[in-house]
Design a protein with these regions (language model features):
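Alpha/beta catalytic cores of group-transfer enzymes, especially the acyltransferase/condensing modules
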Residues: 30-32, 58, 120-272
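Short, Lys/Arg-enriched N-terminal segments with co-localized hydrophobic residues
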Residues: 7-20
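A short, acidic, amphipathic alpha-helical segment used as a generic capping/interface helix at domain edges
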Residues: 271-287
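Non-catalytic positions within long, well-ordered alpha-helices that form the structural scaffold/packing
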Residues: 96, 202, 283-284
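FabD-like malonyl-/acyl-CoA
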Residues: 17, 21-161, 212, 289-319
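Short, charged, surface-exposed secondary-structure boundary motifs
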Residues: 321-327
């Protein structure tokens, strides 16, 4: 552990970064949180400052919640969304503090898109924290608890999963909502329709059809009421043109106009996360290294499955930060 307030030791020199290297940063969404996930960074001043800024923005001690839990409270979506934004941004600031190279492009998975916009300078962190708290509340209230569901379908291609959803639609709304990796698609909708889709997927040869422990059918059209509320809230938020290109989830596009950024966030709440396409877009810009900032290492694993030519790493504690920085001199 570092002495309280001590500067973080640089693992590499900035001027040693290879000229042929180009970095992208990606930020995780819900599901990667865990009690104690920032404890290894506890003595890093910039991490403590980030936690304090978030706590001040919500008038809630997020640092204590992250460090001590309980898990049941941490996993409430109204807490998870601001907590994951805060944790991922803290890891990004730790990278900056350590002298890591700046990204040439950024993206985030679902909630992580908000972290990407903060990292790119489009939304102030102090504004983003209450914004994602509101987003969480709107998403949770759009569909009563117990009426919606989500499931991961493994082993079927995208078109087959879409066909499965169409066949199961007689039982209610069910849609493909997260395209996370080749042959890894998440579906969401009415609980009965999701269960029906899982049965059909298995009959069509899916390796697995796993119900997910979530409180709402995130990114499905059932969350349109949440999108409407989010549009009204975003009208009050100051959004600037990003200083770094941000690839959005809903269109797999880089936009700089603040109104277009807000519109993409509104549609994203009730629309699909096209993560495979986002990573391929990033690769198409000449990026060589994709660094995931935040706990869980989920996106680093997906990156390798999407494009084996990309070098991936995660930053979630001092040891992983050192390893990621060493990639810059490899």
């Amino acid at each position: 552990m570092l002495p309280s307030g001590a500067p973080f030791a640089r693992a590499v020199r900035i001027d040693s970064i290879g000229d042929d290297m180009k970095f992208a940063f990606v930020f995780p969404g819900q599901g990667s949180q865990s009690v104690g996930m920032l404890n290894a960074f506890a003595d890093l001043a910039v991490v403590r400052e980030t936690l304090q800024e978030a706590s001040d923005a919500l008038n809630q001690d997020l640092g204590k919640l992250i460090a001590e839990g309980p898990a049941e409270e941490l996993n409430l979506t109204t807490n998870t969304q601001p907590v994951m934004l805060t944790a991922a941004y803290a890891c990004y600031r730790a990278w900056q503090e350590a002298g890591g190279p700046a990204p040439s492009i950024v993206a985030g998975h679902s909630l992580g898109e908000y972290t990407a916009l903060v990292a790119a300078g489009a939304i102030a962190f102090k504004d983003a924290v209450p914004l994602v708290r509101f987003r969480a509340q709107a998403m949770q209230t759009a569909v009563p608890v117990g009426q919606g569901g989500m499931a991961a379908i493994l082993g079927l291609d995208d078109d087959t999963v879409r066909a499965v959803c169409a066949e199961a639609a007689e039982a209610g709304v069910v849609e493909a909502v997260n395209f996370n990796a080749p042959a890894q698609v998440v579906i969401a909708g009415n609980k009965a329709a999701v269960e029906k889709a899982c049965e059909i997927a298995k009959a069509k040869g899916a390796k697995r059809a796993l119900p997910l422990p979530v409180s709402a059918p995130f990114h499905s059209s059932l969350l349109t009421p949440a999108s409407d509320q989010l549009r009204d809230y975003l009208a009050t938020v100051d959004v600037k043109a990003p200083q770094i290109p941000v690839v959005n989830n809903i269109d797999v596009a880089v936009v700089s106009d603040p109104a277009a950024i807000k519109d993409a966030l509104v549609r994203q709440a009730a629309g699909p996360v096209r993560w495979v396409e986002c990573v391929r877009h990033i690769a198409g810009t000449g990026v060589t290294h994709v660094i995931e900032c935040g706990p869980g290492k989920v996106l680093a694993g997906l990156t390798k499955r999407i494009d084996a030519n990309l070098t991936g790493a995660s930053v979630f504690d001092p040891a992983s930060l050192d390893e990621a920085l060493k990639l810059a001199t490899a």
